[in-house]
A protein has these predicted regions:
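Acidic, Ser/Thr- and proline-rich intrinsically disordered linker/docking segments
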Residues: 1-44, 90-141
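Generic preference for well-ordered secondary structure
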Residues: 3, 48-50, 55-57, 75, ...
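Short, contiguous, helix-prone interaction/anchoring segments in small proteins
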Residues: 33-61
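Alpha-helical context
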Residues: 40-43, 47-51, 67-70, 77, ...
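Phosphoinositide-binding peripheral membrane targeting modules
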Residues: 55-94
Length: 141
């Protein structure tokens, strides 16, 4: 689900909390050593999300916020901010030349550059949280 979060509304907060959980508290975020990525350069994006990025030949940025039951990808377009809300059960991550996140019939590919490499520990943390979440629903062990 993609929401325009330029102006925060109470209904949007409720939808986000229902899909990916409430935000981590200050103490929890310190224990996790951060819950957000640094901004990364978007290299490629699926055609059904292209309307949410800058149309001119400009660099597009996004960052990822970790929640207890999923992630939120913040996409910046000028002065607007769009949120792509992805529960863990929809999230698929591919490590190619850069990183590609797929969910809900959409994808976003981040460029393999310095800012991407600075986020290596964040992606390890993200994968660990996804594995922990998936183990809750592993009924065959």
């Amino acid at each position: 689900m993609i929401l325009d979060s330029t102006y925060s509304l109470e209904e949007q907060k409720q939808i986000i909390n229902d899909l990916v959980g409430k935000p981590y508290s200050f103490i929890e975020s310190i224990k996790l050593k951060g819950i957000g990525s640094k901004r990364m350069v978007i290299e490629d994006i699926s055609s059904n999300i292209k309307q949410y990025i800058n149309t001119v030949e400009d660099i597009n940025y996004a960052n990822i916020e970790l929640r207890s039951a999923g992630v939120i990808i913040h996409i910046n377009k000028g002065l607007q901010t769009f949120l792509w809300i992805i529960p863990f059960y929809h999230l698929v991550i591919y490590k190619t030349n850069g990183l590609s996140i797929h969910a809900q019939g959409r994808f976003i590919h981040f460029k393999n550059n310095v800012t991407f490499k600075e986020n290596k520990t964040f992606f390890e943390k993200l994968l660990n949280e996804k594995i922990k979440h998936d183990l809750k629903y592993d009924f065959y062990t």
